[in-house]
């Protein structure tokens, strides 16, 4: 009798995705982040669910309900901090996952890559709306500044902003709808992640060499299940060190002050994982231009497969492209630093240069370098 694992309609899906999946024998630890993102998503949904049981999405009680969770609910403090720092771990894994895709040419799977970009946008939207919920100073002013950017859209901008706000400013209606969206979006992310995986399994995984590996596949279980468990343990360790020793390390002290529409904080800035995009937004003096640059900073990833001029898929054997890739990483770190600095000299100029360099590397230098490398190999 054939194993039920391979015949039952439900277990068959799990079997073909996580057990008998043919996997390249040489994928490195950089391929761990997909499973880690799945774990992060499950963790965020579970902790978020327990937080939602005690949270109230009303401007008068939102801030005190979060304080109540931390002070009075059994283990509420650890659930709250696991959720807040879990978001940071989520984005660390996301950035490393996208970076892996860029380095090893995983973007040559167009469906998987494009759904990945949609996932990135959706997760960013979810995180932004989640940051508004505690209704601290940075929550309120962050929501005001970012939603206000939509007013830069010609003709319909102002109406659009007021429609999103549910009034003439960020208020009770805004908070309630942000809570509703923040609750539903992770489930949409889960569905998109399933589609992401579906398309990946149509082609099979890429590998560090970028060479087709059909002739050398091994089963996912036990080889990569055990490898993923190691990754999960390291992720859990990092998260719990953060939660138990310095839970507010990545947060903003201003968010411990209740939201006050009459008092603007001296420096309005988003969470650390949005700072690179925020720096690109601020480096353009024109409002509409800034908004376009902000969207394009992520959307530029969709153009990367079209600009792949190399005869090789991966950067493993392309030292010049490797140098450019690490220059891009350094540039993104610079942008992240600039995003957290006040808008004054020399930070403005550094931010503008870093923003120009970001788009130049991805759109101009990488395709040209790939052509140069092809010629060096006499191809």
From Swiss-Prot:
A ubiquinone binds at residue 201. It comes from the Eukaryota. Heme b b566 binds at residues 97, 196. Keywords: Electron transport, Heme, Iron, Membrane, Metal-binding, Mitochondrion, Mitochondrion inner membrane, Respiratory chain, Transmembrane, Transmembrane helix, Transport, Ubiquinone. It is a multi-pass membrane protein. Heme b b562 binds at residues 83, 182. Binds 2 heme b groups non-covalently. The keyword Transport applies. The chain crosses the membrane at residues 33-53, 77-98, 113-133, 178-198, 226-246, 288-308, 320-340, 347-367. Belongs to the cytochrome b family. Component of the ubiquinol-cytochrome c reductase complex (complex III or cytochrome b-c1 complex) that is part of the mitochondrial respiratory chain. The b-c1 complex mediates electron transfer from ubiquinol to cytochrome c. Contributes to the generation of a proton gradient across the mitochondrial membrane that is then used for ATP synthesis. The cytochrome bc1 complex contains 11 subunits: 3 respiratory subunits (MT-CYB, CYC1 and UQCRFS1), 2 core proteins (UQCRC1 and UQCRC2) and 6 low-molecular weight proteins (UQCRH/QCR6, UQCRB/QCR7, UQCRQ/QCR8, UQCR10/QCR9, UQCR11/QCR10 and a cleavage product of UQCRFS1). This cytochrome bc1 complex then forms a dimer. This is Cytochrome b. It comes from Galictis vittata (Grison).
